[in-house]
């Protein structure tokens, strides 16, 4: 049997599990979403000092509850503002730690980057980052004063 490159690519894409984690700590609630191929999971937590201090634990528990390990995450998308200074700062710190410890690439987006878009839902963020060529591993937060 001969397979053409597009068929091989399609077969490989089906076998490779793409797990994306979206973290939004800029709002009133800490929002987490996992996009795992065809499945989408999300959870929210109160945006409080206690939750900031245990953000890594919250993320790890959420990921494990979906039978995924942190090392299975291919990319992290993080809202870098505008919004809560503490939420953004803590989210960025956790994501940078994941980058250093597990070598997971991250993409810092700002909703202003996508101002001409109609669908700003969290599940669309990876596609918007790709469309607008958001650079990976670059942080430029926008805090509210």
Indicate residue ranges for each PLM-predicted region.
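Residue-level detector of alpha-helical recognition elements and their boundaries
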Residues: 70, 91, 109-113
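Stable alpha-helical structural segments in soluble proteins, enriched in small hydrophobic residues
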Residues: 62, 66, 93-95, 99-101, ...
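DPxDG-like acidic metal-binding loop motif
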Residues: 75-80, 85-106
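Phosphate/pyrophosphate-binding loops at sites that engage ATP/ADP/AMP, CoA/4′-phosphopantetheine
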Residues: 59-75
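Short, functional N-terminal and low-complexity linear motifs
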Residues: 23-29, 63-66, 83
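Oxyanion-binding and handling regions
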Residues: 1-57, 105-145
């Amino acid at each position: 049997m001969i397979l053409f490159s597009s068929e091989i690519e399609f077969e490989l894409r089906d076998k490779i599990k793409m797990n994306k984690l979206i973290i939004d700590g800029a709002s009133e609630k800490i929002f987490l979403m996992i996009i795992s191929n065809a499945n989408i999971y999300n959870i929210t937590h109160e945006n409080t000092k206690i939750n900031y201090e245990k953000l890594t634990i919250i993320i790890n528990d959420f990921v494990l509850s979906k039978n995924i390990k942190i090392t299975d995450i291919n990319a992290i998308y993080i809202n870098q503002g505008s919004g809560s200074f503490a939420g953004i700062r803590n989210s960025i710190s956790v994501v940078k730690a994941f980058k250093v410890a597990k070598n997971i690439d991250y993409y810092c987006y700002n909703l202003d980057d996508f101002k001409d878009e109609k669908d700003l839902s969290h599940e669309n963020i990876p596609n918007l980052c790709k469309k607008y060529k958001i650079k990976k591993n670059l942080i430029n937060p926008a805090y509210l004063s």
